[in-house]
Amino acid sequence: MVQGVIELVTHPDRKESPMKLSLNIFVSLDGVMQGPGAPQEDTTGGFTRGGWLVPHLDEEFGRIVDEEWFAHADAVLLGRTTFDMMRPYWSAYPNQEELVARVLNTFPKYLVSDTLTDEQAAWGPTTVIRGDVVEQVRAIKQQPGRELQVHGSWQLAQTLHNAGLVDTYRLLVFPVVVGQGKRLFDEHSRPTAFRTVSRTATAGGLTHLVLEPTEFTSGDLTADGTTDLEADGTEVSATVPA
């Protein structure tokens, strides 16, 4: 694929409205998303605490990932590290009819990489994105369909958040502090508030949050029990319950 040009892939089941972009992320209480599934999954930066989600898995985990994540996908967008991690596992997965395997192996995929050739990136229908990622993802979102889903893909997820391109954030939060590793949000993240669409707590202690971004606001909690909120330079007073 030529740099700066997106080859649009048609999926037969797509709806007519433009696709939404969602981030679907496993995250710890301290915001780490690196190497959740295994010690050697992602050791970049000297990360030694991979596999941190495994002790906390429960029966609801699989249902959430299947029914509330992948069931909404019409296309998948991945960074290089996540692509390289997923491809050997899911391409050889024993039951290719399971939902996650079917989506990852047969649905349109977009890979962000300036180094892999199209031949090296061969995994079902995969298009390599090179050059201006933000503008090319913006163009992909104009295709009809349900969701263009990002899974993992730390650097890509941060880039899309900071560009304001993410429509839905699905965060599966695990009750563990990892203490080191790549974080979804850091001191350079675009300030953003969120509307909670839904939240689910599982028996094993997982919390599934579905969030939509809204405008960041700040305020001043005053001594007289009111708070002054400021949004776009406009002050709004509200009473704080005692």
Residue ranges and their predicted role:
Residues 19-163, 176-242:
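Portal/gating segments that form or line small-molecule/metal binding sites
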Residues 165-174:
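Short hydrophobic/aromatic-enriched beta-strand-loop microsegments
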